């Protein structure tokens, strides 16, 4: 089997997303492991700058049966950000917008926003976001949701799932969906 079986699909992806697609040795190596130290080399790392780019790459991955691993900053100790099947890694760090709706008591945050940034944005509006994993300055809310992060405040206030009331995302087909 070829070390890079998805080269044609990756070329198509580069045509559609351009600079968001990194196939360099260094770029792929940097996304090959997380804090668990489990390591598998992907064929490409895609860093979407707009939400719709996630849908484009998932649609293409689904069409060509390319395995996809979603990654924030790789702080997980569970191995969930390591691309165990190779394929493509979606690096969500650029999708980090945060909007606090103080009147409704809601935070709208991109998957790449760090927990620490969300906490500070909420505090600036008089609100408190309790989940506080020890890696809060580096870990992303997308990863927190995926792993149900808690931290020291978890016993008193609850963990991430207790504070999520709606999600936006994409199905493997690239279709945009909203839950909640």
Q: Which role fits each region the language model picked out?
A:
Residues 1-59, 75-105, 120, 134, ...:
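N-terminal flexible segment immediately upstream of the FAD-binding catalytic core
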Residues 66-67, 128:
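Residue-level detector of anion-binding/catalytic polar loops
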Residues 69-71:
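Conserved PLP-anchoring active-site segment centered on the Schiff-base-forming lysine
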Residues 97-101, 107-180:
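FAD-binding subdomain of flavoenzyme oxidoreductases
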């Amino acid at each position: 089997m070829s070390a890079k079986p998805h080269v044609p699909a990756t070329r198509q992806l580069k045509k559609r997303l351009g600079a968001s697609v990194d196939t360099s040795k260094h770029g792929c190596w940097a996304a090959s492991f997380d804090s668990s130290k489990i390591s598998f080399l992907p064929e490409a790392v895609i860093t979407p700058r707009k939400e719709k780019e996630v849908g484009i790459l998932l649609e293409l991955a689904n069409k060509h049966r390319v395995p996809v691993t979603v990654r924030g900053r790789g702080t997980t100790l569970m191995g969930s950000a390591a691309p165990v099947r190779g394929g493509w890694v979606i690096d969500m760090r650029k999708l980090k917008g945060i909007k606090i709706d103080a009147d409704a008591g809601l935070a709208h945050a991109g998957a790449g926003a760090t927990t620490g940034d969300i906490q500070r944005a909420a505090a600036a509006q008089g609100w408190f976001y309790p989940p506080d994993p020890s890696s809060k300055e580096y870990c992303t809310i997308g990863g927190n949701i995926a792993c149900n992060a808690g931290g020291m405040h978890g016993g008193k206030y609850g963990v991430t799932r207790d504070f999520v009331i709606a999600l936006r995302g994409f199905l493997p087909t690239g279709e945009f969906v909203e839950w909640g």
